[in-house]
């Protein structure tokens, strides 16, 4: 437990309504001299933000997370199936949590995840992945538009700009944060 006055941006709290990430915190003085802590909270697994007021000094339950390494296995309906490398249990992550990160997933990719009571709250891909080029533009098709680069479709369906010398079948390193070509492997 933490006091409401100790809440800070980035903390996770657990309430009777669910799990939340603290997005903003401000101290508000009431008309009768009492102080409240006004907090904007983002609901777990969604983009919904709600505002809550806590009395100054009120105890709030801080959510405890376990960092886990998960290996991607395959997509099953609307969930991505992962293997927890710590205890070898299967963990399902809904598409809503994966969002744009899903475009980099291929079997065997290991991600870092924060787990609370068996549920994945957030995840992070490795910063760099090596992916095979499955299709490219002809060098002349896109050179004039992109300053010497051409479009390449990778094995996971991601499209990136690559130098003209990259060909189908090449394995390239991609920055998953910016979706940019780094080098040919």
Curated annotation (Swiss-Prot):
Its main location: cytoplasm. This is Elongation factor P 1. One of its GO terms (biological process) is peptide biosynthetic process. It is found in: Cytoplasm. Involved in peptide bond synthesis. Stimulates efficient translation and peptide-bond synthesis on native or reconstituted 70S ribosomes in vitro. Probably functions indirectly by altering the affinity of the ribosome for aminoacyl-tRNA, thus increasing their reactivity as acceptors for peptidyl transferase. Belongs to the elongation factor P family. Gene3D superfamilies: 2.30.30.30, Nucleic acid-binding proteins (2.40.50.140). Pathway: Protein biosynthesis; polypeptide chain elongation. GO terms for molecular function: translation elongation factor activity.
């Amino acid at each position: 437990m933490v006091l409401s006055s100790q809440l800070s941006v980035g903390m996770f709290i657990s309430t009777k309504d669910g799990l939340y990430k603290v997005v903003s915190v401000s101290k508000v003085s009431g008309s009768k001299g009492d102080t409240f802590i006004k907090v904007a909270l983002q609901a777990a697994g969604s983009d919904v933000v709600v505002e809550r007021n806590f009395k100054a000094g009120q105890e709030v339950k801080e959510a405890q997370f376990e960092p886990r390494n998960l290996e991607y296995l395959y997509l099953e309906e609307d969930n991505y199936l992962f293997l927890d490398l710590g205890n070898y249990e299967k963990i399902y992550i809904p598409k809503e949590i994966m969002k744009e990160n899903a475009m980099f997933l291929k079997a065997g990719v290991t991600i870092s995840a924060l787990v609370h009571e068996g549920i994945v709250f957030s995840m992070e891909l490795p910063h760099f992945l090596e992916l095979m080029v499955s299709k490219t533009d002809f060098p002349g098709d896109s050179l004039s538009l992109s300053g010497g680069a051409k479009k390449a479709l990778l094995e996971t369906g991601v499209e990136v700009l690559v130098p003209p010398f990259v060909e189908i079948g090449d394995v390239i390193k991609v920055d998953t944060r910016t979706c940019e070509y780094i080098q040919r492997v």
